[in-house]
């Protein structure tokens, strides 16, 4: 048996495997509108390729629709396997001084932000600071080379800030903490109760919320989450995320979140339950082809 994952479609390999009568499976298939248009422009090839899979398992309904058009014969929508991923518990790598500072603050995080979204978050911070004197806003921009532009916007709002790579400059008056490094986002999620996921107020398509929700965070996002629509729809259904459209709505939602006695473990377990069901159902399908061979 040969298993291909998500969008990893290798034409020559698929055709050669099929010649040997080896079962072909496409797990957690993901086809975006952009990639669908490319495959559909060479429909004779795509129908030959996708038609050779014994079964395909799309991770969402959009992919299901595209697979049908592209010639897949047997399609089973079970769900997105990414729900089944587990977070490994491990301590953060912050210095003792930084950990002490964070523990003294009421923290929320704005992650993967794009141009204009940082200003919206900073305005929200300034308003909320009137009520929460120890408030700290952590901003993790999607592109760290924009840090200089972001600091100018923060200066214009007369807010005190510190840049993560300059840890020694942090002090009790720091209001905005700007992260200019890669690979530490999870560490910041672990110390935050609430996370705003960027690329969603602007028309970028949003960011995958599963990493933050698996760590028990309250999720806030803008209206533009088309890249992960079905995940956000499910989170909304479970009451695990909140959509906002502007700074005023962000302020209101954060205020509610700060005073909400939420159970992060409950959120984590909800996602685990969804993931376990998807994983179990997928395993049973794969097992059928293992035994069949």
Stretches with model-predicted labels:
Residues 1-293:
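Nucleotide-activated sugar donor-binding and catalytic core shared by glycosyltransferases
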């Amino acid at each position: 048996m040969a298993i291909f994952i998500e969008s990893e479609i290798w034409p020559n390999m698929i055709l050669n495997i099929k010649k040997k009568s080896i079962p072909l499976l496409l797990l957690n298939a993901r086809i975006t509108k952009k990639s669908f248009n490319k495959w559909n422009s060479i429909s004779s090839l795509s129908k030959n390729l996708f038609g050779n899979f014994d079964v395909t398992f799309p991770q969402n309904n959009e992919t299901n629709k595209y697979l049908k058009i592209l010639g897949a014969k047997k399609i089973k929508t079970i769900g997105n396997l990414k729900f089944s991923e587990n977070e490994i518990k491990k301590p953060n790598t912050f210095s003792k001084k930084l950990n002490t500072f964070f523990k003294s603050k009421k923290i929320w995080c704005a992650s993967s932000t794009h141009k204009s979204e940082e200003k919206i978050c900073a305005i929200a911070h300034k308003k909320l600071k009137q009520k929460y004197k120890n408030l700290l806003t952590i901003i993790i921009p999607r592109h760290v080379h924009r840090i200089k532009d972001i600091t100018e916007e923060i200066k214009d709002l007369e807010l005190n800030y510190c840049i993560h790579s300059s840890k020694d400059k942090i002090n009790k008056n720091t209001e905005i903490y700007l992260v200019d490094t890669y690979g530490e986002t999870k560490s910041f999620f672990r110390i935050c109760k609430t996370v705003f996921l960027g690329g969603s107020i602007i028309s970028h398509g949003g960011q995958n919320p599963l990493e933050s929700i698996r760590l028990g965070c309250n999720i806030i996002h803008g209206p533009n989450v088309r890249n992960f629509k079905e995940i956000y729809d499910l989170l909304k259904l479970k009451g695990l995320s909140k959509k906002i459209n502007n700074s005023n709505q962000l302020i209101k939602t954060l205020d509610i979140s700060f005073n909400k006695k939420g159970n992060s473990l409950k959120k984590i377990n909800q996602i685990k339950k969804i993931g376990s069901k998807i994983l179990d159902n997928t395993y049973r399908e794969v097992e059928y082809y293992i035994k069949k061979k």
